[in-house]
């Protein structure tokens, strides 16, 4: 409850009262004694009403009037400053006072260090030491010395007792007069044991007296009071002790920011007080005098408890020394020794008895607030949290339910119906009410007597004034009040009766007792006479308590209770109230445990009640500090403790409350509560997800938590446990207090800072598993950066423990009926243990009466034993263990057997095993409680875990398999499982060294011949080096290479930092494993293992490298270029070869490109990408493990991993490394026509004229190699001699022209051929190694003067008519110069062109010239052309080696720019890549414009310089469908300018319908070209078809041209930032798993969805509608579908197109070509989302200049829709062309159903009223701006209403 808010008048009166009181006291003392008042307080004159009853003055030594001789001070030289014991603790020191007290005066440069400290003349001497009662007894006589506070007691008695082997007590009392002692009901006198049987020795020094307690085992001194004097006066007791270490914990209640105490001269006052916790040392609600310390890494610890309830302070200084300064009572110390910190806590709790066993429902979540205002509000909060499915057991009401805040009443107006509401709560959970101790003295609201007060008066139950008979009147919430004296047995009877009577009205279930420090809003009492009793209310020494006034905000210190004066028992008020409430609960709920929550506590309070940490504030700091408070109360024996989640005072925030609810779900006591006047903060108010999720986990773990409370009750163990209790051998754990444990086994890591998703967390030395995934974490005894996004808290299970669980529900009543389960977290020895306690959850003495079930669990040797050690709770036997999850197994599980003890084991088939994460999940068990059971699991070798060890060409037999060392197991003919596979223990390399670095890891591997018994192809490399580099936080590299010899590495430059740049925020963790060797990469956020090569089969041989990795899911995409059957890879035992080849697309046929890159989606929705930078021939095998195996025939392993976390972000990260894609010119997005086999220029000219006449959009014309003379590059044939003039003509019309170039240069010419001759001069051609001989393959060029015979076979034609050609070596500098000149000369001397199409650059060869014949053979180096044993799974011609099939010989040589040589064997797959950039450079240097290069062969980074088409496809429906897959894949690979030849290259379609669909689909390829071949296909250009098809072609192409501004903007986004243009649905909707396999639909960017028909004879198409708002592009209408499959109508002339709500698409009216369309009006399509919001951008430039973005020569405009306002913002204006920026119309889609009557346009600083039309049924609104001269290069704003 909140601190009372005083008015300004009240504050003024209080201050005035204090001043007047102080003056009065001073005057009284001066007048009465004629000496200064300060001396009188130190030595008061005894009076009948001023003497504490506990300390009669007659036993005190009078204060001396003469100053004794000063004591001896230590020499200044070498004085131990930190050992000074302060001699003036009550005020700022002065030299005069110091000398008066006989102390040493030495000022210091720091005021926290005492300037005045004790000399050796204070204290006591010990005399008459005798042995008795298992201890010593001695008289201690005061050493004559000046007094500090007067009334020093001359002689005291020391009594020691060796109570137990690990507990020692010493007590110092007044032998002559009974002083006040704490009447603790559970602390019993002990008989003690002989000193010889203890763990400690005790030494008492006599002159001066001091006592030491020494641990026998190591002679460590645990307590040494010789460091300071003993002072013992009537109202001031002081003793100091030196501590054995700096690590101490405890004392309370206060706000301690850290669990370990700060030793730097800190004062902590202890005196119970109603005070708001804050950033200070104020005394708070409790009085806890216990502390403990740890001595060393052996765990040996100690504790000290002072049994004293008087006001005191403890002073801690760095030595370390603790000084107690106490205002009364006696000194009664208990010292505990334990072998561990946990043992010390257990021993302390044994002194005052262990905590009560809570009811099971007490562990459920509770919801409360101060001042709901009415029962209706409470009901609404309950309703919404129930509806949200929040696990929630108890609703609490604060004092606002009462009538005028009177106890045992309820407000019958605001809370009318409360009894019925309580009954409803019982049907769903529990109801808790608050009770304060203060009882109003006023009548009820209706004027009736307040019977609770009346009955209390009758029984004389109140705390009285100093006369012992007059009830003391204070003030609290009800107004003027009296206070029950709970130390009086009559009061306990009255209180129990009142509780019972009220329960008869309102059936509550538990009691929350508050304000019991005890709190009063007036100082002392209404009658101020008590405050004038100086010695109690103004003692000579007042500890550093808040206000420095003993009765501040409480009762007068001379008030009388049954146990004594308030001066002595004040701090016991809450403790005694808890005892009384416990007895009341026993009456109200006979034999039930109920629930008691108290604010004020004392040692032993946990036996009676639970505690919360008080009226905290909604702040991040207080959330953090709450962990220390929780851990401290675990020390104090109050394990059911927690802070108020989300904070009590001040408005919380959503983020703070979310994070606090995550933490609060793991407080032992979990409650959300806040104060009046502040915002609501119940879980359902902020949204249920995070709160519900973690409360559900809490409820799942309640059997574990309940068992921990059983152990706390039985053995005094802690529940919320600091690290040091479990990991005391690790000094890092001694200071950790931002994380904690549940018991020994659950690690909780909360987020305690705003805006943070990465937490610096310490992971102790154990095996840990992610609770939510079961995945084993690699961390151990290290500080890590734990990724915890907004909806996550860190939860980790400790290996070696078994956690009982239960299927959760929304209340414990419901959940207790659900099946039980076990989570077994195995340790390093594959062992674990655990326990379950189960009873009815509420009976008072179920443990004492043995009415419970107790299990112990253990695992060893692959066997889990569930041993029921006690069973006397019959009702519990209906429950059963149904599930068991085992984490951290090392081997796969083949079978499970289960059985009850002494019965036959039976096979159990209901289990799954996660091989990747080694998690066994067993379901459908039926282990009823009370029985004992065994579960055994047997290891297996799953088919899915078999990695083939015979990938060679040909079929293996059992003999060849076993000879190699493989395992053999025949499989059925239908199975793809390999019959030959690696043994699981296969481990040919030993990890010999590993070196973690801040920037990565390095390691060395050594071939281990005895283990390398499997002989893989070629010779193994003996020594390998592993290098892991942490590049940016979202990317890493790991590389395996020959440590002793340089091997070929790919000479392709990547954009990676020169030095790693990652920080502790990186998204991944990497481990290098051994036995077997492997690299593991985990995503920090989920713990998911996303790369795990710790698998059999790793090999690194000279010409055979193999590595396998597990995949995190079955969702994998990429690898190419190969025709795939779907976008998602089929992992059912498929192998795909990669080696660039002149191969038309076909199933499993390696084709033109080489892309060893994949992207994987993890089951959680995260994505990552992996690139293997290797250019040698390879294949990859997928298997359903899921796993992937790479095999390559050379180079090294050089992997790059991109962590995303979304598919599109992972793709962008990959593109950033390989280079962002080239920006095509605007015209390159237009429709393009080509054909292989144009006969002459006239045929092309006729086509062009027909297309223009039909007004079909069309931008680019091509010619294939037919335009050349005999297919010779840089020539024009006779039939095309007029082609240059035709090209000039159409270019004037705005058209563009692209010509083809193949790399092969003929060497058989009889006439001058400059291209060849200059090539010879420049030495540009590929040669045989170590010679000057050119390699002479044959390709397209024909021999001169040869007649072509078209009747012979292809091979015969190659021999008869094809010329010998030389291939330029594009790696050479000289070649780049030569190529640039040939292109330049051709452009300037023969014909103009705008782009270049480079073909046949795999490179393709039809054969090799050998001895006058074309043979598919090479000169030598058979191991290169026919790699030993293994060849990747590649397409070959019969009789050919895989490497040389349609390729140059592998031993031919290339020269790199640095002059080094490489073999075709290594760089074959780079040939096309090496040609693309020189071609683009030459094109741009020649034309001065951007141009475009289209390359058939590609490799990673090709997209930086060129586009690609999908090759020589077929006119089939199958190829149409496959084109979508290829287009999506090439976007992944960084080549967004991609398309297939529309309608195919080969074969006639046979049906016009295929053309209909082909042109519809092709209109939405980024690269839209038709290019059939003459020999196999009819003309397919639009004008070659009937009029209907022509119109349909025109219609769909006009849609494309309309959208080109949007599409061009998407190409710019990819060029500037990477990412896809043609986008899979999953890239935008990755959290919707339905999208993960879709490829027959695609997106343009984020906003435009294409759903084509790709099957014959269909007039409908079924497509998925992702979870967003979608509009039909053709109509603008909202289709009102989300997240479902839907069948759309698809007539032959229509393709389904949809625009995504929330986006704005810039468009432009179409025209015959882009040159003309760019001059038409722009328009905007504004598609509103469900919130009437949308955004979009437009990128504009001149469409053809080079590097416009890089040079700032562009316009960038941002559009935003907000409800009914559309604005544009010009972000960049480096390109100005108003003609191209004219805005003609704006189309608003999804505007809403209200009719629009008014619109305003603000443009150019003026307001306009634009004309508009609307269709209310479609919710569309169209603004016509054509007559308003609006251009987009200036901002606009349109509003409508």
UniProtKB/Swiss-Prot annotation:
Keyword Phosphoprotein on entry: yes
Question: Transmembrane segments in this chain: where?
Answer: 13-32
Q: Where is the P-type domain?
A: 71-120, 936-984
Query: Which ranges make up the Lumenal topological domains here?
Result: 33-1841
Biological process GO annotation list? carbohydrate utilization; intestinal epithelial cell maturation; response to cortisone; response to food; response to fructose; response to glucocorticoid; response to insulin; response to muscle activity
The cysteines covalently paired via disulfide bonds are: 73-104, 87-103, 98-116, 646-657
Return the protein name. Answer: Sucrase-isomaltase, intestinal
| Source species of the chain | Rattus norvegicus (Rat)
